[in-house]
UniProtKB/Swiss-Prot annotation:
Function per UniProt: Required for maturation of 30S ribosomal subunits.
NCBIfam families listed in its UniProt record: PRK14645.1
Protein name, as recorded: Ribosome maturation factor RimP
Record-level GO cellular component terms: cytosol
SUPFAM superfamilies, A to Z: YhbC-like, C-terminal domain, YhbC-like, N-terminal domain
Entry annotated with the keyword Nucleotide-binding: no
Subcellular location: Cytoplasm
Species annotation: Thermus thermophilus (strain ATCC 27634 / DSM 579 / HB8)
Pfam families (alphabetical): DUF150_C, RimP_N
Amino acid sequence: MGVNPPFLCEGGGEVTVDLWQLVEEAVSPLGLDVLEVHFARGELLVRLERKDERPITVADLEEASRHIEAALDREDPIPGSYRLLVESPGPKRPLFTRRHFERFQGLKAKVPGPEGFTGRILRVEGEEVVFQVGDEERRLRIGTFRANLAEWPEEPR
């Protein structure tokens, strides 16, 4: 994929391991996927979803938090103190894989940037996502952009 999943590290000391991989190894056995890892100003934010695509529960997040804490304590990758936040993706969930766009087909997504737009996800064709933007279709190659869900489905997907 041309664009890595969202891992952001801003300011404060050097992080000595791949936090994405560390978190992924901690939560994958729990049936969870990592959507985002962001470290900034003493906070490590982790957003997760269930692999079975059912809604994530507070119990899922609590268990994931315990497993992530254990992995962080074992590896000690972040110098100094920090706060761990483990969350569900929420209403502005990131979309960046083929599976994400297929799962939320028919819903609106926001693509940020200078030429950004909000459009309905029509379909995935090959390596492209096709959006309906006004009266026209726009195609973007998966892995070259990021998007966020701009509306929430009536039923869990």
